[in-house]
């Protein structure tokens, strides 16, 4: 397992740019790694690559050379949008070169705890509300992921006093090796991104990577109304907190037509929830 302190003098390939690739490249460069960036966009039309070259980072643009990995890279950080069947990614895996995404890199270098939110629907709203509530309570949250600043950008400024609230896609979670949020949240699970993952099973496996490294000292909040989610949750080693909107439950978070409950005890009336719609009631469960 690579730790951030081990990245100095390591040869690292960043595959694909956009915001996440730029942030990962800059962070790795600051940590003393020997960084090479490879992006399909031609250099002349690639201001991100031009900016990285100006900082002393090696840039290869316009194509993905078949022999690229012959340079002896010890780690590949790929853009989440690049699939694992990409020839370079597949070749790296065959060579036993670790392949991670920017989220995993951010986790390796950050001193702050993470609250990770994923799901097919509702994750953006949930991430935003959690961030706003922590901010209102002066908890110094930082928002990252698919909304806000990319993960590596946030990790560079985070301290142990911060909490990183991060929205996570299945693309990002496929690259999990050590990522372990203090609190993991799964809002729901429906067919999505099958063009990328191939099957619902592969998509679900990626989503449940959010809890794969958690221990009983961590928390996994999940949608107990969905059988597939319950089956996966049973495999988690985290302290599990189920939620249901199908009536009062003695375990976890629940709701009926009038009230919200915690372990069977009423905590407030549904009528005080300003956001309308059943999906927003479920989003409130995570707070």
Residue ranges and their predicted role:
Residues 1-101, 105, 272, 282, ...:
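N-terminal leader/targeting and accessory segments in enzymes
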Residues 2, 209, 274-276:
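A structural connector/turn signal
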Residues 4, 11, 16, 114-117, ...:
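Short, flexible coil/turn micro-motifs enriched in small/turn-prone residues
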Residues 10, 15-17, 55, 79, ...:
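Adenine nucleotide phosphate-binding catalytic loops in nucleotide-utilizing enzymes
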Residues 17, 39-40, 120, 146, ...:
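Cofactor-binding loop segments of dinucleotide-utilizing enzymes, especially the Rossmann-like FAD-
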Residues 30, 66-73, 80-224, 228-238:
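Phosphate-binding loop of NTP-binding sites
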Residues 31, 182, 265-269:
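Local beta-strand/beta-hairpin segments that build beta-sheet-rich folds
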Residues 35-39, 143, 165, 242:
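Short beta-strand "acidic-cap" motif of Rossmann-like dinucleotide-binding folds
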